[in-house]
């Protein structure tokens, strides 16, 4: 397990940096710049180590047509496009390698004799990192306070980690709320009470950011919780709080009481039109990873499926869409959604957290580029998916 966790640390190590911090190569006298630049190499190192292991062990690729498998095929196609068609080949190859790193790390774990405990550890590491990220922006959030304009704020991260916009910060807050609420409800340990103090700053930040994708995720996660766990006294208390947060932050502050403002795309349609034009110029292979930033004057696609298409063409977009569709078909057909409430600790808690998290990220994929490139969303998505698949494999549904 130790080496697998080390490898997962390498995958996370490249977050909030990139090859731009290596050009020009930082001076050895500027330790922070050197640290940021060298961190950019860590996900690529993780992918390289996993490939060396696969070749040495002659490992069989067991993901097949599962969600991790389809995402890997999408990443491989994007890597080929990066090599052949990208206007900035080195940058595109870097980001495609970084995208494949968590999938290759998960493959390494799945091939171990007992993968489930390692995947549990990955989920707990992810939870700890998201809590850290939320607390890291809390001083900025406290400085901004409440107001209708807070959704335009940019939150500065400590330690030279850069800046995060309100949508990204809202995502941190919602993930903390999901993990905290499920732990308080499903965990038998008294340590679950440690999550209670975190719910207050998480709810404060979620409402402050007025992030529509995060508020939508809160609604989706709430419905999924009722589906997998049923209505309980705790939910009857938390449900109205969630509804009030959505109404106040989303409808009253963000939309100013007008439903039309709530569904306004804030310029996304212009970016989508530019992206579609570029996709039309290379519909089969796309333009390689990071294509939106390279070809659209550093604009972001804000849609996972268009993001996949501009990077890996229409086939890549279909692979990505299939990965999401196959996931939810598997959750339903395998009975995981029905069997979660009967799972033994600690799996019940982690399964519910994973299902709710995947519901949020799936809903977010229509308005943000969730899991279509190397980023926080991808590193949350991959372990949650692999954990659910592995648990279902080790705990098959009883024959009717």
Kindly give the residue locations of the regions a language model identified.
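A membrane-periplasm/extracellular boundary helix in multi-pass inner-membrane enzymes
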Residues: 135-143, 226-265, 273-281
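Transmembrane alpha-helices of multi-pass inner-membrane enzymes
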Residues: 236, 355-364, 369-400
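Aromatic-anchored transmembrane helix interface
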Residues: 67-79, 87-111, 121-134
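Hydrophobic, aromatic-rich transmembrane alpha-helices
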Residues: 1, 8, 43-60, 175-186, ...
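N-terminal signal-anchor transmembrane segment
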Residues: 1-57, 77-85, 136, 361-364, ...
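Alpha-helical transmembrane segments of multi-pass inner-membrane proteins
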Residues: 120-150, 164-228, 329-333
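Hydrophobic transmembrane alpha-helices and their immediate junctions
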Residues: 59, 65, 191, 314-362, ...
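Long extracytoplasmic/lumenal interhelical loops at the membrane interface
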Residues: 25, 253-315, 331-342
């Amino acid at each position: 397990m130790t080496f697998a966790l080390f490898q997962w640390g390498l995958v996370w190590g490249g977050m909030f940096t990139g090859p731009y911090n290596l050009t020009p190569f930082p001076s050895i006298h500027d330790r922070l710049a050197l640290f940021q630049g060298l961190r950019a190499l860590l996900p690529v190192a993780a992918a390289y180590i996993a490939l060396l292991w696969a070749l040495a062990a002659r490992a069989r690729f067991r993901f097949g047509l599962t969600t991790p498998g389809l995402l890997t095929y999408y990443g491989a196609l994007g890597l080929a496009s990066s090599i052949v068609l990208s206007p900035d080949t080195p940058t595109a190859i870097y980001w495609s390698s970084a995208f494949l790193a968590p999938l290759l790390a998960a493959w390494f774990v799945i091939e171990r004799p007992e993968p489930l405990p390692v995947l549990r550890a990955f989920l707990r590491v992810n939870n700890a990192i998201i809590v850290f990220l939320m607390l890291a922006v809390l001083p900025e959030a406290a400085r901004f306070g409440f107001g209708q304009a807070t959704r335009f704020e940019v939150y500065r991260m400590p330690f030279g980690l850069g800046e995060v916009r309100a949508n990204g910060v809202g995502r941190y807050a919602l993930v903390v709320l999901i993990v905290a609420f499920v732990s308080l409800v499903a965990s038998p340990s008294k340590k679950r009470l440690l999550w209670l103090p975190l719910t207050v700053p998480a709810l404060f930040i979620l409402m402050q950011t007025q992030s529509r994708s995060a508020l939508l995720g809160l609604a989706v996660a709430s419905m999924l919780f009722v589906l997998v766990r049923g209505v309980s006294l705790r939910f009857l208390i938390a449900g109205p709080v969630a509804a009030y947060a959505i109404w106040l932050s989303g409808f009253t502050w963000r939309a100013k009481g007008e439903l039309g403002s709530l569904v306004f795309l804030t310029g996304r349609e212009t970016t989508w039109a530019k992206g579609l034009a570029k996709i039309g110029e290379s519909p089969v292979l796309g333009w390689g990873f990071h294509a939106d930033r390279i070809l659209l004057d550093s604009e972001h696609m804000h849609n996972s499926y268009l993001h996949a298409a501009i990077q890996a063409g229409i086939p890549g977009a279909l692979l990505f869409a299939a990965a999401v569709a196959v996931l939810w078909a598997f959750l339903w057909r395998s009975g995981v959604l029905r069997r979660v409430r009967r799972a033994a600790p600690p799996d019940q808690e982690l399964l519910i957290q994973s299902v709710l998290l995947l519901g949020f990220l799936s809903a977010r994929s229509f308005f943000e580029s969730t899991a279509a490139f190397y980023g926080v969303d991808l590193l949350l998505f991959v372990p949650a998916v692999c954990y659910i698949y592995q648990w279902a494999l080790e705990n098959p549904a009883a024959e009717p």
